[in-house]
């Protein structure tokens, strides 16, 4: 069973990831990820991206879009198994398209996988999908 120190270290690595995302900080994103040709990333609405160079390029494209962003991870759950960690959470996003318009809000669900390498937790997989709006359920929907 993972001890509290390991869970806190994974939580810190996960927070660094979201800090890099919110600040559009490519250098910090470089520090968060493991630089291997097998790491994977799936952004909402994107195809699977494989390999650090392509994953890095995807973050560069997102950050170059110019939209400011606030992101908060909520309902974070962490499981550590040996040198691997699974983090699941919701991402609550506020995207600022310009300095005048109201932000666009979105909620995604994410799975982040980390591997401990030389005592440091590095991201090896990020998958985020938009949470669909729940359809309104009427009484007639419940009658079979």
What are the residue ranges of the model-derived segments?
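A beta-strand edge to alpha-helix "cap/lid" segment located at domain peripheries
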Residues: 2-31, 39-144
């Amino acid at each position: 069973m993972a001890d509290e120190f390991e869970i806190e270290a994974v939580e810190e690595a996960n927070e660094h990831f979201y800090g890099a995302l919110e600040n559009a900080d490519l250098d910090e994103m470089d520090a968060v990820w493991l630089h291997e040709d097998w790491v994977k990333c799936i952004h909402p609405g994107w195809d699977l991206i494989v390999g650090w160079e392509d994953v890095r390029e995807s973050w560069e494209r997102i950050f170059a879009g110019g939209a400011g962003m606030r992101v908060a991870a909520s309902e974070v759950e962490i499981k550590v198994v040996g040198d691997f960690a699974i983090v699941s959470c919701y991402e609550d996003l506020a995207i600022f398209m310009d300095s005048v318009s109201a932000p666009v809000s979105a909620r995604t669900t994410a799975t982040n996988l980390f591997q401990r390498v030389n005592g440091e937790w590095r991201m090896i997989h990020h998958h985020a999908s938009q949470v669909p709006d729940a359809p309104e359920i009427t009484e007639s929907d419940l009658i079979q």
